[in-house]
Amino acid sequence: YFNRYGNYPGVGAWQSEDSPWRDAFYFHEDGSYDCWWGVGNMPAINESSELVRERLLGKDGVIRKWLRAGAHGWRLDVADELSDDFLTEIKKAVLAEKPDALLLGEVWEDASNKISYGHLRRYLQGSELDSAMDYPFRDMVIGFLMGYKNAYQAAEDIETLRENYPREALACALNLLSSHDRPRIISVLGGGPDESQLPESERSKWRLDDNSMGLAKSRFWLATLMQMTFPGVPSIYYGDEYGLEGLTDPGNRRTMPTKEDLHDFDTFAIVKNASAVRRALPFMIDGEIKAFALNDEVLAYNRTGKDGESATVIINRSLRNSHRVTIPALGECASDVISGHECEIH
């Protein structure tokens, strides 16, 4: 389509004004063209081009073709770069092919009130995205476990998401702890440095020491438990289940170790056990949530199902202290899902 470097047969938009794909991009009189954040090999696409719309949104276009082939939805990279009108057209194409398909957007902030390029976006108003990557969830988890915010502030963050997001959008938000754009969670929870503190030659090789890794694993259990008991869809970034380390690119995108190279299965057991809690309590998937703080270091939230069954998740972030707390409860008895112990309610 663009073919600036002549790698493909035929004449691309960059090579000739007569190319049928010329109006699919934004060219200027001097031959320069618009591109994403100045990256020359990522030319900006003209959303109003009929050729672009047909190739992406038409009956045999990219969106519908791959849904027809078996995909169950699409994740749109950098949704902020797409106009509301174009997102609406993408949603129409998705629904025309597969009414129950998911349309998810990469949005780093609260998707219900995001302002990009000076405009309040309409992501979650029904005609565009079904939901978004839940970076606010990630920020809340890290902020609380690392001591950047107390339990009252973390509970407020949870309540803000609950109040701002439509129930359906919160239920299918992508709850991530790591991504290809952010440092890996195990490195963050172990107190990994700001990359600007490291020479570029050391960034991809940086690793936690043994003491820091032990601390990171303790926090990883809490983070993963929150991920598996929070409304939305848990998203495990490849290698996180094996404690793969890494700051930002390229450290967070390095090759997945082979089975023979894996020697530490603590984090795998953590993910497995936290996942078991989610599977054992179906209302963790579609139940209501209500968050509250028990003191500065203890965060809690209730999950309640349609039949009234409920569970309270309690997170003590303290490295040294146990806390005696009082929690609201319904019913006559309760059981500890993790230990299996039962107790009477007084």
Description of each model-found segment:
Residues 1-69, 90-96, 113:
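Substrate-binding/active-site clefts of carbohydrate-active enzymes
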Residues 2-10, 62, 72, 77-173, ...:
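Active-site-proximal helices and loops of the catalytic beta/alpha 8
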Residues 66, 76, 103, 180, ...:
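Conserved, mostly hydrophobic/aromatic
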Residues 152-200:
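Aromatic-lined glycan-binding groove of carbohydrate-active enzymes
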Residues 284-308:
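Surface beta-strand/loop "capping" patches
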Residues 309-317:
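Short, well-ordered beta-strand segments enriched in hydrophobic/aromatic residues
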Residues 344-346:
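C-terminal beta-strand-rich structural cap/linker in extracellular carbohydrate-active enzymes
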